[in-house]
A protein has these predicted regions:
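Motif-centric detector for short Cys/His coordination patterns
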Residues: 1-159
Length: 159
């Protein structure tokens, strides 16, 4: 992994620093690009930048068009024609959901959040672009699975 990734500004970054609420990127050609920190995910002005920093800078935020969930992958189709795919195992609630539950989703926000109300799961597009998976704890998943089992048993007993 390189220390800094190319920003496609005609020159390679040579230094990245945080000053106040701005990210300053100094380029090899001497130019400095200033980016508001709120545009850069998971950085704050109080935390030092990690030794190896990669930046993903987008001209326009991507938008979700539709979603297709298979038994092994979450496939997110973007409005610009691209498709983003990641392992379904990254999202345990989707992995354990039924086909009907997986297919019952809404695109929220500015077309950048996918919400499955039946599974109580939200996936942010930016998190997928960063290669991030669910951060829900194993304990929380186990409680959720147990509550599903209890609800399923109650339906069978009532029916």
């Amino acid at each position: 992994m390189s220390t800094l990734s190319s920003l496609y500004l005609g020159s390679e970054p040579t230094q990245v620093t945080v000053e106040g609420d701005q990210l300053l990127v100094t380029l090899a050609d001497g130019r400095t690009v200033t980016i508001p920190l709120q545009w850069v995910s998971q950085l704050s002005q109080t935390e030092p930048l990690p030794g190896e920093t990669q930046l993903l800078i987008l001209r326009r935020p991507p938008r979700v068009d539709h979603v297709h969930v298979t038994d092994s992958a979450l496939n997110v189709y973007l409005q610009d024609g691209r498709m983003l795919s990641c392992p379904l195992a990254w999202f345990p609630r989707l992995l354990h959901g039924t086909l009907a539950e997986r297919n019952h989703y809404q695109v929220l926000g500015e077309d950048d959040v996918i919400h499955w109300s039946d599974l109580d799961e939200d996936v942010e597009l930016l998190r997928l672009l960063e290669g991030g998976k669910s951060i829900e704890s194993e304990r929380s998943i186990q409680r959720w699975l147990m509550s599903r089992k209890v609800a399923s048993s109650a339906k069978v007993a009532a029916g």
